[in-house]
């Protein structure tokens, strides 16, 4: 199914050109759609790996898609803010032409340095809040039995936050996935 969905983008220049122009003109809409589809697909595959099924009662694929879409718009906003702001800050701190270096076509050590600085800054400031909020929304969806009603039911923040496994959140999610996966991943992308 995934191959069928993506195949037209590889076979038709017209379809791919339309995608690129729509993405450029409607970045937030596309962020919502891409994250709703691809991130939810990742969660479904994760469930398949961990539980042997693609869906189960209470999992809430539709609410997860909506939440991922909203989170995707936040991620898009963060990428714009940090990719513009960090090079400006680097120039303020003394690196000449950091913004122009980052947006140039040419690959250079300075460009990699700017990309790494953007990634480290974004993932240090934004990612912990984002990941915690995502964990809260996932827990809320599960508490609502995976129902679409979870999208309009107030989130019991205190109950969920105090019930989070902070040992895992700190020692694995923050201390391992952010520096060892997200720093390099966002430096490359």
Predicted regions, residues:
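Loop-to-helix transition at the N-terminal end of transmembrane alpha-helices
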Residues: 21-40
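Hydrophobic alpha-helical membrane segments
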Residues: 166-186
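Hydrophobic/aromatic-rich structural module bridging two neighboring secondary-structure elements via a short loop
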Residues: 50-81
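Alpha-helical transmembrane segments of multi-pass membrane proteins
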Residues: 2-17
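Hydrophobic cores of alpha-helical transmembrane segments in multi-pass inner/ER membrane proteins
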Residues: 34-44, 128-132
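Membrane-helix interface linkers and caps
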Residues: 14-23, 44-61
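Membrane-interface interhelical connector segments
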Residues: 86-113, 144-157
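Transmembrane alpha-helix/helix-exit interface in multi-pass inner-membrane proteins
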Residues: 72-93, 119-149
